[in-house]
């Protein structure tokens, strides 16, 4: 009887370890989602929404979401919280299926296939403010960069960003990786 008890206890521990191990392995990044957990595919119209920072412009984000056709919105950032989720999902008056904020704070996380898939499945992408140097150093030449370019060039969904998120959306960008520059310096030698 004692042998049977230990066998059952061992199986229970093994089952717990497997379940816990799979749970821990299931998501190795931070994200928050509001709205439907079911992915939808909607008809979208491409567009770029560039905002300089500070207070978000409701009309600009509404314009972006109207182009998303009621689909899923992904918000990318390298630090912070889910501050955009409720605002974008329920305070703008433009229905979307869901809003998910994903924190990508390392190059390793920018290589997670599940994150790239979530980005590729989005009908709108918004890149929050922060530090554009971290966006460049974490995302450049990774599946996240490929997924963002796929949304813009192939799927043609609306993409927007504010502050640092705006700064990295062009073909040429100011990364602020090595130092900063004043307006007077930049205007005196814009091609340096």
Task: For every predicted segment, state its role.
Residues 12, 93, 153-156:
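Intrinsically disordered, low-complexity coil segments
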Residues 27-134:
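Extended, subdomain-level signal for the structured scaffold at the beginning of enzyme domains
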């Amino acid at each position: 009887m004692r042998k049977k008890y230990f066998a059952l206890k061992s199986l229970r521990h093994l089952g717990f370890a497997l379940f816990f191990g799979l749970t821990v392995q299931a998501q190795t990044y931070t994200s928050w989602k509001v709205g439907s957990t079911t992915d939808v595919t909607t008809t979208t119209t491409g567009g770029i929404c560039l905002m300089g920072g500070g207070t978000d412009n409701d009309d600009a984000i509404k314009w972006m979401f109207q182009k998303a056709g009621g689909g899923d919105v992904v918000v990318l950032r390298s630090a912070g919280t889910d501050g955009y989720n409720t605002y974008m999902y329920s305070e703008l008056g433009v229905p979307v299926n869901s809003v998910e904020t994903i924190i990508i704070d390392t190059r390793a996380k920018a290589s997670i296939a599940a994150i790239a898939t979530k980005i590729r499945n989005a009908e709108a992408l918004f890149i929050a403010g922060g530090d554009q140097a971290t966006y460049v150093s974490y995302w450049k030449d990774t599946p996240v960069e490929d997924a963002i370019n796929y949304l813009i060039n192939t799927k043609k969904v609306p993409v927007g960003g504010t502050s640092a998120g705006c700064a990295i959306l062009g073909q040429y960008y100011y990364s602020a990786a090595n130092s900063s520059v004043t307006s007077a310096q930049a205007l005196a030698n814009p091609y340096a």
